[in-house]
Amino acid sequence: MNKLIDEITKSQLNPDVPNFRPGDTVRVHAKVVEGTRERIQLFEGVVIKRRGAGISETFTVRKISNSVGVERTFPVHTPRIAKLEVIRRGKVRRAKLYYLRNLRGKAARIKEIR
């Protein structure tokens, strides 16, 4: 039974997911359906967490919009993501960056890997 589940989930994995980690700044091109129309919505921010494995793996992106923090969680292998771009590589020493929720302005910046 497990082999069958593994084969099915392996066929559903998205092969062109870039290598990204918490602390990286990414731009997610998400497909949004409004009525009968489908359009692409950009969401750019810092990856604050990545959890799970395989088909159920998700990541959360945080951005500041109109001085309000907005977090959005995406499944890594969903067909609703048209494209995922890594803008900057961040240097962090944690896997979960929840502490960024309490920081404002320059304190919330993440050092870039050269």
Curated annotation (Swiss-Prot):
Cellular component, GO annotation: cytosolic large ribosomal subunit
InterPro entries given in the database record: Ribosomal_bL19, Ribosomal_bL19_CS, Ribosomal_bL19_sf, Translation_prot_SH3-like_sf
Pfam families cross-referenced by the UniProt entry: Ribosomal_L19
Keywords per UniProt: Ribonucleoprotein, Ribosomal protein
Statement: the UniProt record of this protein carries the keyword Ribosomal protein: yes
GO molecular-function terms, A-Z: structural constituent of ribosome
Record bears the keyword Disulfide bond: no
Disulfide bonds: none
Signal peptide range in chain numbering: none
GO BP of this protein: translation
Family to which this protein belongs: Belongs to the bacterial ribosomal protein bL19 family.
Database matches in HAMAP family: Ribosomal_bL19
Function: This protein is located at the 30S-50S ribosomal subunit interface and may play a role in the structure and function of the aminoacyl-tRNA binding site.
NCBIfam families in UniProt: rplS_bact
Name of the featured protein: Large ribosomal subunit protein bL19
Organism, as annotated: Listeria monocytogenes serovar 1/2a (strain ATCC BAA-679 / EGD-e)
Gene (UniProt): rplS
